[in-house]
Swiss-Prot record:
Name used for this protein in its record: Probable metal-nicotianamine transporter YSL8
Keyword Ligase found: no
A GO-annotated cellular component: membrane
Lineage: Eukaryota, Viridiplantae, Streptophyta, Embryophyta, Tracheophyta
UniProt entry tagged with the keyword Transmembrane: yes
Residues spanning the membrane: 38-58, 62-82, 110-130, 154-174, 215-235, 265-285, 319-339, 393-413, 421-441, 467-487, 506-526, 567-587, 608-628, 643-663
Cited function: May be involved in the transport of nicotianamine-chelated metals.
Source species of the chain: Oryza sativa subsp. japonica
Mode of membrane association: Multi-pass membrane protein
Amino acid sequence: MMAAAAGEGEAEVTREVISVSTEKAFEGKALPAWSEQITVRSLVVSAVLGTFLSFIVMKLNLTSGIVPSLNVSAGLLAFFLMKTWTSALERCGVFPKPFTRQENTVVQTCVISCSSIAFSGGFGTYILGMSKKIAEGFDEAEAKTSINVEEPSLGRLIAFLFLVSFVGLFSIVPLRKIMIISYKLTYPSGSATAHLINSFHTPQGAIQAKHQVSILFKSFVGSFLWSLFQWFYAAGPGCGFSSFPTFGMVAYSRRFYFDFSATYVGVGMICPYIINFSLLIGSVVSWGIMWPYIESKKGSWYDAGLPKSSLHGLNGYQVFISIAMIVGDGLFNFFSIVLRTAYDLYLKRRGGASKQPQETPFAGATGTERQVLSFDDRRRTQVFLKDQIPTTIAAAAYVLLAAISVVAIPHIFRQLRPKHVVWAYVVAPLFAFCNAYGTGLTDWSLSSSYGKLAIFIFGANIGAKDGGVVAGLAACGLMMGIVSTASDLVQDFKTGYLTLTSPRSMFVSQVLGTGMGCIISPMVFWMFYKANNIGMEEGFPAPYAKIYRGIALLGVNGWDQLPRYCLRFCLAFFLLAIAICALKEVAKQRGWWIQDFIPSALGMAVPFFLGSFFTIDMCVGSLVLFLWSRSDPVRAHTFAPAVASGLICGDGIWSLPSSILSLANVNPPMCMRVFSTATNDKVQLFLRTLPTPP
């Protein structure tokens, strides 16, 4: 989801044709050696920002599972902190080395690789899906046995992440020149980040960046103070502004309300309009139409006495219909990108054999039509090929890490056998290449789709009696860890290519950032896990953890346990998701005007299970951006990302002091609740029966 929302938004940046040479502006500046691009100050700033953003990503991951791209936030904050560092030293009479765009790129890479572990590490998906808290929401006795439940452990989490997160880096290194130089893949998010960094280090761009940082800081402070204010009124479940029935009590019971979350207002400002529109459509279809209808069949389609969490009741429809849409969307995009990748590679090979340039359907996406290298391309290619990363070392490192994992991972998750890990590491490089190539074409990472595929295959192969639920989820983590980091690395190579940053320094910064993330993210998760109601509607619902466990249960048990007509609904919405994706793809290829108005099937699926409260927040964010763009398009384009980032960061970082207060048993002093008139009358009658306090 993260890649989906971020990719559609950031791709717009790279569609602009830049006619002025970027590298001519930097021609007089000396290019630092790769070892000089990685400095102590860059690592310190990376660790601080990585921790900061990890809290934000973790909170988003555990609430809705929708995490937008934070590249703009990371870029602005890295530039601001590094400039502040150097300016402070200069005022003290110490003149450090100049802050270059190469060092800026290293910080950006390190920060994003660190904070992305909070997402790809599975804390809101497969790791939490193994836990007893999530398993208790499913009434399958077989899935609650000890063999199918694994409680998170801080030491095991860190060890597992170290084992799986580095392998993907080495699997894709030998193909970096093919991806960046030969195929000239665009990697829209990486290119957008590079253009942002390049602009910071021009005189005009530096001035604009200072204004953006100022706006971001003001937005951050306002968001943080608003979260602090809300905390005082949230003493219990259903208390505070986050439970305010904005549209009335009936709508509130259907999860239609505005919960005053600055985070999701900011997310709504960053995500494309069509994503927010898709969420709203999904909310109306599910909570406005479908669930009330199915609930009216209580006692006929399913037992009326079942608890809310039972998969044999309404919850079963909610979970598995949303899974059907997510899987349908994922499978379509998976096969679409695999076929596009294979066809594009075939045309390139045929074109190379005939020595004639071939026009491909995706030439606009890959940029293969360039025949004469510009000054910028020649300069960037020269730098990119200068500092090599030996292929033999990368291959040896992959084999060594794979061998260690084959021995160690079965000790971390006893449900996985060494042969399962071997098979995963055999096919992972192929999937890593497909995902990295597809991301370069479309800016859409399918790492979660490969993970879901692993859940089905390994879960079904092992079976419920031998721990197939946990084994499938662990295999999902293994596959996602390899595939996700591989595509992230090539994306960063593209950023380095466009900023004349050495690929060797980029690789080292990615390794260092990943190492930081493997320690920081589990510790951040552990604080959330111990201090909050993870998996509960009041707190952090972690919807994708339930969905991933539901997928694992389907893998080991099949469809037999579903309530009446649920399979038919699942099939219908599975086909609907494929039809929507197909229509969107055809409209895009043919240039139909309706392409921008076709909703995202994945976006529609998320509120099917979670509800509509965050959807309203995101639509408010879209409305704010729309009105701002209509009244002042230039300032909106320049400063809206900074305002949105500040809203996200301020509310997100409040989770740190909030968790500390919770661990210290410091609770909010007041509870603000809204009752209907009838309920209020009952409350008043009850209060009159209580003795008057002295």
